């Protein structure tokens, strides 16, 4: 099959540092290739360019990984009428409607629940249930939970920092690092955005790691912390921590896909 994966066009794919959605798209394309399919990535914020690039080949399936592009789905279909089309929303507050107006998500969500033409690949069962509750067409809803690839991670059975906890993620209000920065033995890693009171000059902030550095050093730690106030489902970084052998401490929003009875969750 010839499959197109449409990214947001905000950062490069594969990402050099932060970028969970971009990492997932890259992993999808890689896995598709290993299964004998063609996984073509189109990653630009320019809607006209997306449509132009898609029109240059014949695709069997097109998966748009950015809900903001809902407004060009019909144009995409007009260039590829024989292809199956799907869209996924990676918006973290789908199940919190009070947040939608603040983020300009109202129109997007309205389209997602009224759309009866294209598949909506839900990133989590939590999102699926939210759409279902608001009467989205069930024949267009499919749950497609994201996983984490394990092959490239360096595994250390005995971590070099067993008493340290890593808080890995973009430094932003939603991830709430600023709330916990004063706690000893937590080290923070992630892209700094200057949107909270988080002190980037503190000793506990290690800066932003490259993707390659993350692969090598996540297992330096005994566990990972993520107490965000909204997530699509369980974030990729938590799944990466688990396959790397770390225990995790997470908020309810980051625990949707986890078995909370396990001793390391």
Label every PLM stretch briefly.
Residues 3-4, 61-63, 76-96, 121:
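Active-site proximal beta-strand in glycosyltransferases
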Residues 93, 101-120, 219:
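Membrane-proximal helix-turn-helix segments that form the acceptor-binding/catalytic region
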Residues 97-98, 132, 143-163:
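Acidic anion/phosphate-binding donor-loop and adjacent secondary structure
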Residues 121, 157-175, 181-189:
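Conserved donor-binding/catalytic core segment of Leloir-type glycosyltransferases
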Residues 215-216, 238-243, 257:
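Short alpha-helical segment that forms part of, or immediately flanks, the ligand-binding pocket
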Residues 219-233, 246:
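Acidic donor-binding loop of glycosyltransferase active sites
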Residues 238, 247-250:
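Short hydrophobic beta-strand element within catalytic cores of glycosyltransferases
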């Amino acid at each position: 099959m010839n499959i197109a994966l449409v990214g947001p066009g905000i950062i490069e794919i594969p990402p050099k540092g932060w970028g969970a959605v971009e990492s997932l798209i890259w992993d999808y394309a890689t896995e598709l290739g290993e299964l004998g399919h063609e996984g073509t990535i189109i990653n630009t914020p320019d809607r006209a360019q997306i449509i132009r690039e898609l029109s240059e080949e014949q695709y069997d399936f097109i998966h748009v990984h950015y809900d903001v592009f809902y407004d060009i789905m019909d144009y995409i279909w007009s260039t590829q009428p024989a292809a199956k089309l799907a869209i996924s929303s990676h918006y973290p507050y789908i199940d919190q409607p009070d947040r939608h107006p603040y983020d300009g998500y109202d129109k997007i969500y309205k389209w997602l629940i009224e759309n009866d033409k294209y598949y909506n690949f839900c990133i989590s069962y939590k999102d699926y249930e939210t759409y279902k509750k608001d009467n989205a067409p069930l024949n267009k809803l499919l749950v497609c939970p994201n996983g984490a690839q394990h092959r490239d991670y360096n595994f250390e059975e005995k971590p070099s920092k067993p008493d340290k906890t890593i808080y890995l993620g973009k430094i932003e209000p939603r991830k709430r690092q600023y709330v916990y920065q004063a706690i000893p033995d937590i080290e923070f890693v992630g892209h700094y955005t200057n949107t909270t009171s988080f002190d980037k000059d503190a000793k506990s902030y290690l800066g932003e790691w490259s993707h390659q550095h993350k692969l090598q050093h996540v297992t330096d730690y005994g566990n990972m912390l993520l107490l965000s106030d909204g997530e699509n489902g369980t974030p990729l970084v938590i799944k990466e921590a688990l396959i790397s052998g770390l225990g995790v401490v997470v908020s309810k929003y980051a625990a949707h896909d986890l078995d909370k009875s396990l001793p390391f969750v």
